[in-house]
Amino acid sequence: MVKLDIGECKQTTTGVVGCIQYIDHFGNLVSNIPASYVQGKTWYVQADGLSIPSCETYSDVKVGEVVALVGSHGWVEIAINSGNAHSKLQLDWQETLQVILT
C-alpha cells in the first residue's frame, strides 16, 4: 500500500483550511479536518464557492440537502442526505475547503 501525503489542515483567523482526503463509498467528501476543531462550536464549510451549513446528524436536514458534519471516523465531511456529494458537487480528492467558525 502506498500512503499519499495530503498535508495537514491549518488554522486561520476565521477557522481551519483543509482538503478532501478521501471519498467514501457513499460519495461523502471526507476532509483532513478533525472533529476537535468544530466540536461545541457553530460552523459551516466553504468549498468551490459554496457555503455548506453544518448539522449534527443527517436527520437534521431534508433528503437531498447538502450538509457538513462530523462523520463516524471523526473527520469533518461534506455529504448529501440520502445522496452522493461527490457526484452532485463535482468536488474531488485534495480539493481545498475551509471551515468557518461563527
Q: Which residue stretches match the model-derived regions?
A:
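A residue-level signal for beta-strand positions that form part of recognition/binding surfaces
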Residues: 17, 66, 96
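Anionic-ligand-binding alpha/beta catalytic cores of soluble enzymes and soluble regulatory domains
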Residues: 1-32, 37
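Surface-exposed interaction regions enriched in Ser/Thr/Asp/Glu
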Residues: 93-102
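A conserved acidic, glycine/proline-rich C-terminal tail/linker
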Residues: 30-90
